[in-house]
Regions:
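DNA-contacting surface of Y-family translesion DNA polymerases
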Residues: 1-129, 145
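Acidic, metal-coordinating catalytic segment for phosphate/diphosphate chemistry
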Residues: 94, 101-189
């Protein structure tokens, strides 16, 4: 070992050590936080109503927010997208998306849901049969790095964060993972 160290450069030394069974490069993958979280689905039956799409978007937002909190992160924006069945040329084709920037980066399901519903309402068109929809959370940062808003009190922020933790704990212990959900929607299975 000392001869190799004296005679060759560090790359050659590491190669020699690796060939002799001594790992020199850490091969364990680092767990990186996601830069975006997407939750979407194609529907078995097409959805024609705003109410039907609202329930689907609410479910997707709830799932995405749960993933966000699981990695101790917050999102500064939420995008909603909807599209008709592109394989059905006999039907009117439509796809659109909208993004809402949050007042403050958050992982609060109700705040994200309010923004998602507003985005959905801005792009929904009556008379279209929708086949696919989804949400994308972006602008993701670690929850310790969130720039607080001047318009949201620290006390309110802490209460909301504690509420989300309690809801996640209860839901994690249930078989369906949606024992407790936002009252304005029913989870879509």
């Amino acid at each position: 070992y000392s001869t190799i160290h004296k005679e060759f450069n560090i790359t050659t030394e590491r190669t020699w050590r690796e060939l002799n069974g001594e790992p020199c490069v850490d091969m364990t993958p680092e767990e990186t936080e996601k830069k975006q979280i997407c939750c979407s689905r194609s529907f078995g039956e097409m959805i024609k109503t705003l109410d039907g799409l609202t329930k689907a978007i609410a479910t997707f937002t709830t799932i995405a927010a749960r993933k966000l909190r699981k990695q101790n992160s917050c999102a500064s924006a939420i995008s909603v997208f909807i599209q008709s069945n592109r394989f059905r040329n006999d039907m009117e084709q439509y796809s659109n998306s909208a993004i809402r920037i949050m007042e403050e980066s958050t992982a609060d399901t109700s705040m994200l849901l309010n923004a998602a519903i507003k985005a959905l309402e801005s792009i929904f068109r009556h008379g279209i049969s929708y086949k696919r929809a989804g949400v994308i959370l972006s602008g993701i940062v670690n929850d310790t790095l969130v720039q607080p808003s001047l318009f949201i009190s620290q006390d309110k922020r802490e209460r909301r964060n504690n509420l989300m933790k309690i809801i996640d704990t209860i839901n994690a212990s249930s078989a369906t993972h949606d024992t407790i959900h936002i009252a304005s929607y029913e989870p879509v299975s």
